């Protein structure tokens, strides 16, 4: 890989973007970044606090700035937030500045992977499955729209998925 290409991971919460991203970056000797973690670093607060104080709109503004900044770098793997693709500007940034990999997963797997995670503000409701179904309906077409590669993450370990991505990208 002569040119340092960026790899942007998109997909719903619970797809494994952060875990797979770390493995992928390590295997390819690239920097790993997580947009949610970067927001927390910049604000000095967790995502739930940002949602509580600034609402989803404030969070999305911060997310757009973080992704714009990070996507300017070269040679990174970036795990994006599940809702980041709702912004046309973010979709354009990602498409123009690297390879977009959509990590696809089922609602059942999302529920299993996120059920005990209290750091996901959108799922702190009585019926998280319904929320995930509604999000999938609006977001999945957006993930597909910008994806250069689609990889299913349900039945594989993060290491195996990272290797599948490398294989599909021809690295």
Swiss-Prot record:
Quaternary structure note: Monomer.
Gene transcribed to yield this protein: aroK
EC number: 2.7.1.71
Bound cofactor: record note: Binds 1 Mg(2+) ion per subunit.
GO molecular function: ATP binding; magnesium ion binding; shikimate kinase activity
Family: Belongs to the shikimate kinase family.
Subcellular location: Cytoplasm
Pathway(s) of this molecule: Metabolic intermediate biosynthesis; chorismate biosynthesis; chorismate from D-erythrose 4-phosphate and phosphoenolpyruvate: step 5/7
Annotated transmembrane regions: none
Catalytic activity: shikimate + ATP = 3-phosphoshikimate + ADP + H(+)
Cofactor(s) demanded: Mg(2+)
Positions bound to substrate: 36, 60, 82, 139
Residues reported in the UniProt entry to bind ATP: 14-19, 120, 156
Main location (coarse class): cytoplasm
Swiss-Prot/TrEMBL keywords: Amino-acid biosynthesis, Aromatic amino acid biosynthesis, ATP-binding, Cytoplasm, Kinase, Magnesium, Metal-binding, Nucleotide-binding, Transferase
Function recorded in the entry: Catalyzes the specific phosphorylation of the 3-hydroxyl group of shikimic acid using ATP as a cosubstrate.
Name of this chain's protein: Shikimate kinase
Biological process according to GO: amino acid biosynthetic process; aromatic amino acid family biosynthetic process; chorismate biosynthetic process
Binding residues annotated for Mg(2+), in chain numbering: 18
InterPro entries on file: P-loop_NTPase, Shikimate/glucono_kinase, Shikimate_kinase/TSH1, Shikimate_kinase_CS
Statement: the UniProt record of this protein carries the keyword S-adenosyl-L-methionine: no
Coiled coil location: none
GO cellular component terms listed in the entry, alphabetical order: cytosol
